[in-house]
């Protein structure tokens, strides 16, 4: 045991000797580098090299040095500056700074800077000093001063130390603003003193500029102060109006209105009130006002003065000078506006009055005034007939209409070509892009100056007679200038004598302008009546009407002929016979009756059969007899023979045969189809409904019209069957079978119900059928 202890002592002495003995050999710098490199490779040592690579340091020591730098800089250190001071790469500094901030809750890493609580406490003290000095601070000001984010300053500095280091309070309306109670009291005192000194309306902006108080604080403290006045609004142009001034204004306005029953906007504006209408409504909530452009008239003035005077004017059939009953300072424009407003509010019947230059005439007064002019208009009309002036006007008008009709025909042809081109473009566009733009027609509304009362009615009568020049598709069409039988000077000369007695001769021209068109229409109507009363005119009109009627029937026969030629020979023969029996017989009647009238023969019945016509033809002049007999015989022949015979009759009657215009055929076919559709919609009889539907489908499928009776329905359906799908054919077959069923049978009620249900489907098919629908169904 003792030997062991001795051994321990000996070893301790050797160890102490070894420690006290200096090393005889020292490692070189290269050896040290190799040793450290070896340790680093084996990951036995972790060091951080300096930027020049000559020195290295352990991360823990570097972390302590970063904290030392933070302390040396007063609690706020920029990592870039720390990197330069320690000569270490910035990324290493940032990494260690993030670790320091994560491990220590009192240190913050913010925008590349380390900030500790000591620095935050320091800037809180500075903020408190600034708040005490200025009374108010905002986060935006602090952000620019301390170069820190606004959210960090508000949450980690101001709000954290508010009430502790920072002595103040936060604005409830704006949490980014802080102020002291003393500052609020100073602002209250400034506002109270400024408002107490004001005696007239003053702009709020001027007040704020003088007392150096923010607008938000001014409006928030205004209710607490309870000033002797009110602010008009919280807008930029708001004004403060003292109660004493408002009372003075109200007293003046009340006094003026009580004396005059009206208020001028300009006078109210001079009192410092910008919106006069709103002020009047607020000042007199129980009063009714008529607000004009420059004045507001009270209801008492309107009811007791204007309305009563107008009623008296209408009752006495006289006139009224409004300038004598309205306030003298009203201009003529104000008076006109007041009259329009009274009429618009239906206090009086507008048709009873005419307003001219502040004078209101009753309609009865003007009617009596211009009564002599009616006799003059009738005399001028008779004179125009006697002199041939009106006859010349009729001839020129007829020639102009013929020229316009020819121009319209050319325009229609051009429009038809244009429509076809547009249709092709639309189809091409729809095939490529799924649709095209639809053409729109722009309508322009004329802007005419309308006169009051019934003046518009007098000027409206002859609008169609005005000079017009219309341009359409490059063609210029002119209408004959309207014949003016009555001149304005004629009316003025008649009414001026009466107006001079009343001192209203200056209104003779406006009154004449009101009635010029009406009197001219009276004269033209009388002239037309006298013109039509002559036998020569009656004969000419009858000749033109028969000529137009026969030509229309011939065009219809030609179009019907195209349709019936689509059927088999036997059916075609029957359709031709029916066509000539109906339309051909009508043409024969028209021409025979016309010739009988020309030969001064009286005919009791206008609906003649073949035998009656032949008997009547035997009594006619020889120049007509052969042609009419040949026409009646042609009714039993072909359509071509009948047309040739009819042309001979027209030639004998000196009537013009119009040439066939194939370009108008489509419009006639469409019009015929529309008439059939209208009859179909109004039809409730199954047989007639089936007949109309068959004709409509035939026109839609073939593009031709057909004149056929009900017995041809089966033939028509047989012809168009190939263009209908199976459900559509079955529908017509069932309807036809039900129609032919015995109405008195036991199943008549059931048959009627089925007919009613199928009729709607037939009407829908006839209306909406198209060739495209058949191809889709197939």
Swiss-Prot record:
Biological process annotations from GO: protein K69-linked ufmylation; regulation of proteasomal ubiquitin-dependent protein catabolic process; response to endoplasmic reticulum stress
UniProt KW Cell wall biogenesis/degradation keyword: no
GO molecular function, one term: UFM1 ligase activity
Organism from which the protein derives: Drosophila virilis (Fruit fly)
Pfam families documented for this protein: E3_UFM1_ligase (PF09743), UFL1 (PF23659), UFL1_C (PF25041)
UniProt KW keywords: Transferase, Ubl conjugation pathway
Catalytic activity, EC: 2.3.2.-
Family per similarity comment: Belongs to the UFL1 family.
One Gene Ontology cellular component: endoplasmic reticulum membrane
Composition skew (Basic residues), residue ranges: 445-457
Taxonomic placement: Eukaryota, Metazoa, Ecdysozoa, Arthropoda, Hexapoda
Region annotation (Disordered) ranges: 404-477
Its biological purpose: E3 UFM1-protein ligase that mediates ufmylation of target proteins.
Protein name: E3 UFM1-protein ligase 1 homolog
InterPro entries: Ufl1, Ufl1-like_C, Ufl1_dom, Ufl1_N
């Amino acid at each position: 045991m003792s030997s062991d202890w001795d051994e321990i002592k000996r070893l301790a002495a050797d160890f102490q000797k070894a420690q006290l003995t200096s090393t005889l050999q020292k490692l070189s710098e290269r050896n040290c580098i190799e040793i450290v490199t070896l340790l680093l490779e084996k990951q036995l040592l972790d060091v951080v090299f300096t930027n020049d690579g000559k020195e290295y340091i352990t991360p823990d020591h570097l972390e302590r040095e970063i904290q030392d730098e933070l302390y040396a800089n007063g609690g706020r250190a920029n990592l870039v500056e720390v990197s330069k001071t320690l000569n270490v790469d910035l990324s290493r500094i940032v990494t260690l700074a993030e670790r320091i901030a994560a491990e220590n809750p009192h240190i913050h890493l913010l925008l590349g800077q380390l900030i500790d609580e000591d620095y935050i406490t320091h800037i809180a003290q500075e903020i408190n000093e600034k708040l005490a000095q200025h009374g108010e601070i905002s986060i935006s000001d602090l952000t620019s001063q301390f170069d820190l984010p606004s959210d960090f300053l508000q949450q980690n500095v101001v709000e954290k130390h508010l009430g502790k280091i920072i002595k103040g309070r936060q604005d409830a309306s704006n949490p980014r603003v802080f102020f002291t109670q003393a500052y609020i009291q100073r602002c209250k005192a400034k506002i109270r003193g400024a408002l107490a000194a004001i005696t007239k309306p003053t702009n709020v902006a001027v007040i704020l500029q003088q007392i150096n108080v923010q607008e938000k604080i001014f409006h928030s403290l205004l209710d607490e102060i309870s000033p002797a006045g009110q602010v008009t609004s919280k807008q930029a142009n708001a004004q403060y109006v003292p109660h004493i001034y408002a009372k003075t204004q109200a007293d003046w306005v009340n006094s003026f209105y009580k004396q005059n029953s009206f208020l001028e906007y300009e006078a109210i504006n001079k009192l410092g009130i910008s919106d006069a209408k709103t002020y009047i409504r607020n000042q007199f909530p129980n009063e009714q006002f008529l607000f004009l452009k420059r004045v507001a008239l009270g209801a008492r003035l309107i009811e007791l003065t204007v309305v009563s005077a107008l009623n008296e004017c209408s009752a006495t059939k006289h006139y009224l000078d409004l300038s004598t009953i309205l306030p003298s300072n009203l201009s003529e424009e104000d008076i006109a506006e007041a009259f329009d407003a009274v009429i618009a509010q239906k206090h009086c019947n507008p048709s009873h009055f005419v307003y001219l230059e502040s004078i209101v005439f009753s309609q009865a007064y003007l009617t009596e005034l211009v009564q002599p002019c009616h006799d003059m208009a009738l005399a001028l009309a008779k004179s125009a007939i006697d002199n041939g002036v009106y006859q010349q006007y009729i001839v020129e008008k007829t020639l102009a209409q013929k020229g316009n009709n020819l121009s319209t025909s050319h325009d229609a042809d051009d429009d038809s070509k244009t429509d076809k081109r547009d249709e092709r473009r639309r189809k091409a566009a729809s095939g490529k892009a799924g649709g095209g733009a639809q053409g729109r027609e722009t309508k322009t509304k004329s802007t005419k100056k309308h006169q009051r009362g019934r003046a518009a009615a007098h000027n409206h009568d002859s609008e169609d007679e005005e000079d017009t020049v219309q341009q359409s598709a490059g063609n210029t069409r002119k209408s004959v200038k309207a014949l003016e039988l009555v001149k304005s000077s004629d009316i003025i000369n008649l009414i001026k004598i009466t107006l001079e007695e009343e001192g209203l001769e200056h209104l003779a021209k406006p009154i004449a302008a009101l009635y010029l068109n009406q009197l001219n229409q009276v004269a033209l109507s009388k002239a037309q009546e006298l013109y039509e009363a002559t036998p020569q005119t009656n004969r000419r009109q009858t000749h033109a009407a028969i000529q137009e009627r026969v030509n229309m029937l011939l065009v219809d026969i030609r179009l019907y002929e195209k349709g019936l030629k689509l059927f088999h020979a036997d059916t075609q023969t029957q359709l031709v016979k029916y066509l000539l029996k109906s339309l051909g017989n009508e043409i024969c009647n028209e021409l025979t009756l016309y010739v009988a009238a020309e030969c001064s023969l009286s005919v009791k019945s206008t609906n003649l059969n073949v035998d009656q016509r032949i008997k009547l033809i035997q009594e006619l002049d020889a120049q007509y007899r052969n042609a009419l007999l040949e026409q009646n015989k042609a009714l039993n022949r072909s359509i071509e023979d009948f047309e040739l015979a009819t042309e001979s009759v027209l030639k004998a009657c000196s009537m013009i045969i119009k040439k066939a215009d194939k370009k108008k055929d489509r419009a006639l076919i469409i019009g015929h189809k529309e008439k059939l559709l209208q009859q179909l919609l109004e039809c409730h009889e199954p047989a007639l409904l089936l007949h109309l539907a068959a004709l409509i489908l035939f026109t839609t499928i073939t593009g031709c019209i057909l004149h056929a009776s009900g017995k041809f329905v089966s033939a028509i359906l047989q012809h168009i069957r190939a263009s209908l799908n199976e459900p559509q054919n079955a529908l017509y077959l069932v309807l036809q079978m039900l129609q032919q069923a015995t109405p008195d049978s036991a199943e008549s009620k059931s048959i009627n119900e089925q007919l009613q249900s199928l009729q709607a489907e037939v009407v829908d098919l006839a209306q909406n059928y198209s060739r495209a629908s058949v191809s889709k169904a197939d």
